Design a protein with these regions (language model features):
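Conserved non-catalytic scaffold segment of RNase H-like nuclease domains
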Residues: 1-111
């Protein structure tokens, strides 16, 4: 089983664009806790930044501290960059997943709940 732990930062709270995507793969061999050991391995942590088509709101900058100048050399956002997974884990995950309509997870875990 493959889980992706991920988070996005956006250019605005409403109608924003993804300006940062961070994720980490977590793999499980599929053995559950009642059947025996459940080895879990962690993959690489990846952080990618993107230049928005519009600007970055002051409120968004205050939250994530990413300034427009930090994105001058960044490529545009590509929704294909979030890897496919069996489970997606994130904080306020419904907000983050709306930027990746091509990813339909089997399950999600929201740390906001």
């Amino acid at each position: 089983m493959r889980a992706i732990l991920f988070d996005t930062e956006t250019s605005a709270k409403e109608n924003g664009e993804v300006i940062e995507l961070s994720y980490c793969d977590v793999y499980c061999d599929g053995v559950d806790e009642f059947s025996g050991p459940n080895p879990i391995s962690r993959g690489t942590i990846t952080t990618l930044r993107f230049k928005p088509k519009g600007g970055i709101s002051f409120g968004a900058c205050a939250v994530h501290h990413i300034l427009p100048a930090d994105l001058d050399d960044a490529p545009p956002f590509d929704l294909e960059l979030l890897p496919p997974a069996d489970i997606y884990v994130g904080h306020n995950i419904d907000f983050d997943l709306k930027f990746f309509p091509n990813r339909t997870p089997v399950r999600t875990i929201d740390t906001l709940a």
